[in-house]
Structure formats: structure tokens, C-alpha cells
Regions:
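Short, cationic motifs built from Arg/Lys/His that form the positively charged side of catalytic pockets
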Residues: 23-24, 82
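N-terminal secretory signal peptides
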Residues: 1-22, 48
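N-terminal, polar/Ser/Thr-rich
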Residues: 26, 52-53
Length: 305
């Protein structure tokens, strides 16, 4: 089956978007990280290529799912995902346990239909569910997978194992040996580190900040406060909103290569929680960087949704 990418953005339909209050109630301050922008000719080409870096290869059919990141508590599931092509109609999350089945319609997370999230409530604590993603016609978008809710506060598990890590972001770099690299570690090496952590079968993972490295200003020397080379080459309209137009395209272009190929679908059965740090607000923190400029604050907030 062939697919032609639509020329127009999806029109804003308020019921397609998850209300901010629900996100805050669910995550209670923790959130996922995504950000970035750089729209000159060279970054467009290089970052577009990185966008398609092969995610973690495994014996599971990801279909058209580019990346999938779940979070849970004892009665709720929140799944954020992106697809290799835009979906013009809302996909659905199918949740099964024993003889019980329910369908949860996706909330649109961008304006083009590539990014969606699914929010399910009133689930049972400490219960494994079988999940699957479907298009609006019921066709499978990927293979099924298991995901468990957390125990209730009244339960007393004998043990828990949590994976903690930090500073996993950054565009693709080169590694030649110990102490010899250019830029960030290659995605393949970061994937191996995460897979090693997942091999210990943690019940959850916490990514402690710096998911995106794309500082827009420099804060050293005579040029303190001026746009960095990345900032000069970016195409941001700092007076405009983040979502829609070139600002959204720029954010996706820089964020995609730092998130989607790194995680792929490897964490589909491991709830992961993203905390934000300085670089997730588009700066390397300094006394001069506060308060965070309005536009960069909107970037940070947008990447949490």
C-alpha cells in the first residue's frame, strides 16, 4: 500500500489534544524531553539523515511506529509515540486483560499527525495488560506488547529495581576510542548502554535531564548573551508560538535525531520518566541565563506534552 504525505497540516481540533491539566495530574511535575532547532542547509541534510538512524533492532515488529515511550502509575497509562508517516485520523490504543478489552483514542501531539499520545485511566493496580496500536479502521500499526501498572500505595512489594541515567541527548557524534571522540557519542553506543540497563529488567527508568543539547546562546567571553553558532543558523521566530509553521518543523528536526532513534521501541514495556535540566531549556545554565526567556520556556514546555 502506498501513502502520499498530505500537503496541509491537520487543522486544530481541540478534542484531539490532551488537556494540560490531565498531563499535570498524571505526571505530577515529571515529563518527557524533546526540543531543538537548526534550519540551515547543512543541518537540514545531516539531521534529516540522523532522523532515520536505525532504532534498537530486536525481535519485535514496530510497524510504522518510530518511537514509543510509556509512563504508568497504579491506575493509569500514558503512552507517547511517533510514526514514520502522518496519520490523518486518530489512532487507537487497544488494552486487553483477560476477557476485558477497551479502546482509547489518541490525542494529537503536533499539527501534522506524526506525534500522538494515549491516556488510559481506571486500570487495575499491579496488573499486566496487552497493548496494541491500531489505525482508525482497526488495522495494526505495530505488534502487540505487554505493559504493567504499578502496585497500589497499599501494597508492599518485596523489591523494586529502577534504572537511573542522565545526559543521554545530543546529535550523532563520532567515537574513535577512549578519550577520542568528535561531538557526542554515536547513537549506537548510547543504545548499547540503554540496552545493558534494560537487561536488568527494571520496573521503571528515570532519565535525569539533558535529553537535548542545542544551546541557543553563548555565555562566555565578550559575546556573552549573543546567539551561539547554532542559534545564528537556526530559523526560529522568537516572537512566535512554537507549534505550527517553521518553529515546529525546526523543533522536530533537531529533537527527532536525539530521541526517536535512541529509544525506538526498546522501552515499550518499561515505564520511563523524563526530568528536565538546563540544556532542555536550550541553554547551558549560568547565572546569566535566568530567568529563562519566554520562547525557550515555551520550547521546554512544548517538549513535555
Amino acid at each position: 500500500m502506498t501513502y502520499k504525505k498530505p500537503d496541509k497540516k491537520i487543522k486544530n481540533k481541540s478534542n484531539w489534544y490532551l488537556p494540560p491539566l490531565k498531563r499535570r495530574d498524571f505526571l505530577r511535575g515529571s515529563a518527557g524531553g524533546m526540543a531543538g532547532a537548526w534550519l540551515s542547509t547543512w543541518p537540514w541534510q545531516k539531521l534529516s539523515a540522523q532522523q532515520n538512524l536505525n532504532p534498537v533492532t530486536e525481535d519485535w515488529d514496530s510497524g510504522i511506529v518510530r518511537h514509543l515511550l510509556p509512563a504508568v502509575n497504579e491506575t493509569q497509562i500514558l503512552i507517547k509515540t511517533s510514526f514514520t508517516r502522518a496519520l490523518r485520523e486518530a489512532p487507537r490504543l487497544r488494552i486487553q486483560n483477560g476477557g476485558s478489552t477497551r479502546l482509547v483514542e489518541g490525542y494529537l501531539n503536533d499539527t501534522s499527525g506524526e506525534f500522538w499520545q494515549f491516556y488510559a485511566i481506571d486500570l487495575q493496580p499491579d496488573t499486566e495488560y496487552e497493548l496494541s496500536l491500531q489505525d482508525s479502521r482497526g488495522n495494526a500499526l505495530c505488534e502487540r506488547w505487554p505493559l504493567s501498572t504499578f502496585p497500589s500505595p497499599q501494597q508492599n512489594p518485596e523489591k523494586v529495581r529502577v534504572l537511573f541515567y542522565t545526559c543521554a541527548g545530543g546529535p550523532e557524534g563520532e567515537y574513535f576510542g577512549i578519550g577520542d571522540r568528535r561531538g557526542n557519542l554515536p547513537i549506537a553506543i548510547r543504545q548499547r548502554l540503554l540496552r545493558r540497563g534494560l537487561s536488568f529488567t527494571p520496573q521503571a527508568a528515570v532519565a535525569n535531564g539533558d535529553h537535548i543539547y542545542w544551546d541557543l546562546h553563548t555565555w562566555q567571553g565578550d559575546r556573552a548573551g549573543e546567539l551561539s553558532p547554532a542559534g545564528q543558523l537556526s530559523n526560529f521566530d522568537f516572537a512566535a508560538r512554537v507549534m505550527g509553521g517553521s518553529n515546529e518543523d525546526a523543533m522536530k528536526l533537531a529533537a527527532g535525531p536525539q530521541i526517536a532513534p535512541l529509544y525506538g521501541t526498546a522501552f515499550r514495556s518499561t515505564p520511563v520518566y523524563f526530568l528536565q535540566d538546563d540544556h532542555d531549556h536550550w541553554e547551558n545554565d549560568s547565572p546569566l541565563t535566568y530567568p529563562v526567556p519566554w520562547f525557550q520556556l515555551q520550547l521546554a514546555r512544548t517538549t513535555q506534552q
